[in-house]
Structure formats: C-alpha cells, structure tokens
C-alpha cells in the first residue's frame, strides 16, 4: 500500500494532500468534507471534481491539511493537490486532468501596494485647482 503526497496552492492557501488506495474516505483538517465546508455545494463539487473526472471517488482515501486564505481559495488549493496526487498515483489520469486545467497552478495573487498610491493601482484624488 503506497501513500502519495502532493501539495496544492491557490492565492495564500496551501493544501497538503496524502492519497492512499481505500474506500473513498475524505478527511480535511481531521473533519469530513461536510463538516469542513458546511452547506456550500458549489465548493464541494469543486473539491470533488478531480475524483469524479477520474472515477476514483470510491477507490482512494484522501487525508488533507489546508491552511491560509478563505474557503474558496482553500477548496481550489485542495482540488489542485488532489489532482497532483492522482497524477502521481496513475499517469493515465494526466490525459483527463490536464485538458481541464486541474494540474496547472493558478498564479493569480494579490498585487502589491505601491508607494505614492492608496492601494495597488488607486491613486490619490487629483485636483486641478
């Protein structure tokens, strides 16, 4: 029985994912998916997407630790980590995951604040007179 480790990232959220062959148990921060997310069905589907695409929702166990960011960023980091772990588990899954963009790290992060500006791009109000 081999244990596969992968990390997923999105904005400031980081997901550490361990994948093992099993019965389809999903543990996130020592909680089930429903306890961790509550009633957010759209975010649940986002997390389950790589498992559903590869038809592995009943054949692998996933244990994950997620921190940083908000729920949406954490869910996308988790999806990225699960996709990378599935790719390492069986290279044939790459053909399914890659076209959907699930193996690609979303590099969009918050732009830094610049001096002389109020925010990243917002300038102080300009007055001609």
From Swiss-Prot:
Superkingdom of the organism of origin: Bacteria
Q: Which InterPro entries match?
A: Ribosomal_Su5_D2-typ_SF, Ribosomal_uS9, Ribosomal_uS9_bac/plastid, Ribosomal_uS9_CS, Ribsml_uS5_D2-typ_fold_subgr
State the organism of origin.
Helicobacter pylori (strain Shi470)
Keywords, A to Z, come to: Ribonucleoprotein, Ribosomal protein
* UniProt-recorded name of the protein: Small ribosomal subunit protein uS9
Q: Which GO terms describe its cellular component?
A: cytosolic small ribosomal subunit
* Pfam families associated with the record: Ribosomal_S9
Q: Which GO terms describe its biological process?
A: translation
State one molecular function term (GO).
RNA binding
Query: What family does the entry list?
Result: Belongs to the universal ribosomal protein uS9 family.
Gene assigned in the entry: rpsI
